[in-house]
UniProtKB/Swiss-Prot annotation:
Subunit structure: Homodimer. UreD, UreF and UreG form a complex that acts as a GTP-hydrolysis-dependent molecular chaperone, activating the urease apoprotein by helping to assemble the nickel containing metallocenter of UreC. The UreE protein probably delivers the nickel.
UniProt protein name: Urease accessory protein UreG
Sample GO molecular function, one term: GTP binding
Gene name per UniProt: ureG
Xref: HAMAP family: UreG
Source organism per UniProt: Paraburkholderia xenovorans (strain LB400)
Keyword terms of this UniProt record: Chaperone, Cytoplasm, GTP-binding, Nickel insertion, Nucleotide-binding
Length: 217
């Protein structure tokens, strides 16, 4: 199914509130691009969306989102970071800040700017200059112990997504243990168990973005 047609926009923002910038991070293969695709498809009818993807040497994630019809091609921008992925979202986020500016020049009435980081380790976090909300994605296939390994992505992100719950029996992971460890490491910060390929848990992520991002009163 093709993404819906969006009408042409003027170059001046007409909405009172600034766009919400949502950073999506996590290790390689955890499901970041899948989450971004599902979020775009779930929210594009109600919100004006644009997406920015980060890869080190290619624009593969941009291509995947475009082929999947997550959004019209012009609303998806790929950024080649050319180095450590975490640098482009934290220490020197200028390349992504420039990408955000370019997208908002094209689509000044965007409600949400999704920014997907390149795959990285558990220490990666988004600069507060770049992201208003951060979602960190890990997956069950990475091992039952992943939540208790900690790191800023697991302990400090606004929402932790534990993806691929359907693989737990195949890798010998206990989901109850993972949930308990996530709660211990995160305290009051929320987390959600997901099987994104089956859309299981996606509604929780959407509602979190809407509530935390003040998109709905």
């Amino acid at each position: 199914m093709n993404a819906p047609h969006h009408p042409a926009h003027s170059t001046v923002r007409t909405k009172k509130l600034p766009p919400l910038r949502v950073g999506v991070g996590g290790p390689v293969g955890s499901g970041k691009t899948t989450l971004l695709e599902m979020l775009c498809k779930a929210m594009r009818e109600q919100y004006d969306l644009v997406a920015i993807t980060n890869d080190i040497y290619t624009k593969e994630d941009q291509r995947l989102l475009t082929v999947a019809g997550a959004l019209p091609a012009e609303r998806i921008m790929g950024v080649e970071t050319g180095g450590c992925p975490h640098t482009a979202i934290r220490e020197d986020a200028s390349i992504n800040l420039e990408a955000v500016d370019r997208m908002l020049t094209r689509f000044p009435d965007a409600d949400i700017v999704f920014i997907e980081s390149g795959g990285d380790n558990l220490a990666a976090t988004f600069s507060p200059e770049l992201s208003d909300l951060t979602i960190y994605v890990i997956d069950v296939a990475g091992g039952e112990k992943i939540p208790r390994k900690g790191g800023p992505g697991i302990t400090k992100s606004d929402l932790l997504v534990i993806n691929k719950t359907d693989l737990a029996p195949m890798v010998g992971a206990n989901l109850e243990v993972m949930a308990a460890d996530a709660k211990k490491m995160r305290g009051e910060r929320p987390f959600v168990m997901c099987n994104l390929k089956a859309l299981d848990g996606l509604d929780v992520v959407v509602k979190f973005i809407e509530k935390k991002g003040l998109l709905k009163v």
